[in-house]
């Protein structure tokens, strides 16, 4: 590294798809440093218990935090960081700032419950969430802000989730210019939002390194079958009971909107009961409606609630468990193991007139995965000790994924002239496959995969070297 030239050390702390945290250390030409994080999330999924996070980052050594979006695997550890002493700014889009409290409070309530049931620790308090929110700096899309006299940041719209951002970081000093684009979890479109191209000046940036997700680095868009709507139409024509597992933020609202559009088109009856269960689903649904202007929802999408909708609570749920036909349920959790879904599934699985849908990924060990993989007529044992014979039809689709497929990521890269590309957020195999494709199809040789133990040093010419630490 030439003396007097700025560079940045980039380290990813997550090998897979959860626990997102990228530490960035800017080294200026005068020897001074500025450190910022992109995201600070919890580890989730099989083998984790909702209390794991990267605890190797010291709050006193971080100068600012940039948040790409409000999924707990990206923002869930922020109150822990604040509790440990972080007292500086947390930048995010204004749409993310409008909803971030819902997920953090839900995480806190789950921790309180698990503290009693499983004797697990409570890692932060309600006051820590309140303090975290006080430190938020809400930024509009395409608004450029200074986080240091030589560092500018611009949040750019992203279809992954309402409020999600790709984040452009520009380091500019006499010794050199470095441009960095962090995609976050990226998708080029969103049913609720008008996702516009980035400003032309962003695509034209020189000295650019892209730090991109690679969740579906081995999957192409033409490999994903779109079956859900046809299946729902067919099931409604048969007066079936339809049960959908759904994540409370984003996925549940999209399913509601798609049902509403099927109703408006006359494809399913408007009087078909639509039952929504899950506290986070209800909270996000009404927050989206209340803050639709901040969220910049498309005008036609603001009426996303289906006809004949009912929001379910603990009091009304027991009677609904006895339903045998003619109803559409949408319930958390997305993988079936938690929330009301864990109660509904054992009741509905033995119903020959039920269609049970998993509209997303189901990880190993989850209830959704178990019922998808079980054969018809197989006996399924539940955690409480009772068993049920699988008689319902169980289907799964990947069409609602909020992540770009590999071909969409390659197409996204083609709008730029990057000197180098770093990949993160994906299983190791998917990152390796996408890296090889980037090198072959785009001719970019300066590539790397972020992971524990490695720091990539980036300067005005892209990746300079990888340092093992």
Task: Give the predicted meaning of each segment.
Residues 25-27, 170-172, 197-200, 227-228, ...:
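Short, solvent-exposed amphipathic alpha-helical segments in soluble enzyme
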Residues 228-367, 424:
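Hard-cation-handling environments
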Residues 150-155, 287-295, 409-412, 458-469:
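Short, surface-exposed amphipathic charged segments that create phosphate/polyanion-binding patches used
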Residues 221-225, 305-316, 334-337, 375-378, ...:
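A general structural motif
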Residues 2-66, 71, 75, 80-254, ...:
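His/Asp/Glu-rich metal-coordinating catalytic cores
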Residues 380-412:
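Generic long, charged, amphipathic alpha-helical segments
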Residues 413, 417-423:
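Proline-aspartate-enriched helix->loop->beta-strand connector
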Residues 432-455:
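Short acidic, glycine/proline-enriched helix-loop-strand junctions
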């Amino acid at each position: 590294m030439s003396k007097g030239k700025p560079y940045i050390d980039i380290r990813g702390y997550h090998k897979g798809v959860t626990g997102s945290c990228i530490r960035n250390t800017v080294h200026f030409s005068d020897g001074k440093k500025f450190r910022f994080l992109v995201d600070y999330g919890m580890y989730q999924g099989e083998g984790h218990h909702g209390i794991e996070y990267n605890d190797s980052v010291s709050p006193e050594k971080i100068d600012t935090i940039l948040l790409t979006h409000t999924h707990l695997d990206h923002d869930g550890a922020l109150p822990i960081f604040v509790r440990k002493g972080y007292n500086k700014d947390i930048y995010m889009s204004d749409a993310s700032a409008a909803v971030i409290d819902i997920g953090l409070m839900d995480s806190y309530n789950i921790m309180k419950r698990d503290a009693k049931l499983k004797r697990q620790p409570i890692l932060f308090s309600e006051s820590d969430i309140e303090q975290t929110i006080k430190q938020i700096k809400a930024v509009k899309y395409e608004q450029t802000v200074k986080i240091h006299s030589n560092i500018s940041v611009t949040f750019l719209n992203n279809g992954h989730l309402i409020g999600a951002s790709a984040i452009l970081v520009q380091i500019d000093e006499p010794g050199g210019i470095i441009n960095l684009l962090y995609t976050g979890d990226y998708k080029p479109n969103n049913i609720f939002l008008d996702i516009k191209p980035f400003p032309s000046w962003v695509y034209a940036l020189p000295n650019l390194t892209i730090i991109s997700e690679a969740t579906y680095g081995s999957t192409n868009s033409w490999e994903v079958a779109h079956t859900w709507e046809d299946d729902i139409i067919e099931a409604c024509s048969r007066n079936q009971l339809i049960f959908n597992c759904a994540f409370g933020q984003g996925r549940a609202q999209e399913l509601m909107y798609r049902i509403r559009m099927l109703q408006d088109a006359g494809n399913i009856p408007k009087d078909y009961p639509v039952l929504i269960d899950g506290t986070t689903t209800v909270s996000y649904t009404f927050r989206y409606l209340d803050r639709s202007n901040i969220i910049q929802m498309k005008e036609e999408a603001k009426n996303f609630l289906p006809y004949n909708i009912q929001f379910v609570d603990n009091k009304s749920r027991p009677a609904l468990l006895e339903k045998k036909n003619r109803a559409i349920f949408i319930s958390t959790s997305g993988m079936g193991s938690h929330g009301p879904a864990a109660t509904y599934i054992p009741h509905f699985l033995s119903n020959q007139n039920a269609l049970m849908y998993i509209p997303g990924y189901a990880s190993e060990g989850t209830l959704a995965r178990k019922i998808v993989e079980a054969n018809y007529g197989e006996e399924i044992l539940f955690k409480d000790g009772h068993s049920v014979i699988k008689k319902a039809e169980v289907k799964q689709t990947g069409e609602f994924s909020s992540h770009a497929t590999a071909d969409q990521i390659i197409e996204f890269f083609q709008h730029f002239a990057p000197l180098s590309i770093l990949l993160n957020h994906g299983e190791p195999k998917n990152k390796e496959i996408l890296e090889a494709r980037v090198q072959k199809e785009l001719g970019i040789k300066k590539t790397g995969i972020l992971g524990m133990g490695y720091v990539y040093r980036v300067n005005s010419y892209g990746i300079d070297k990888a340092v093992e630490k």
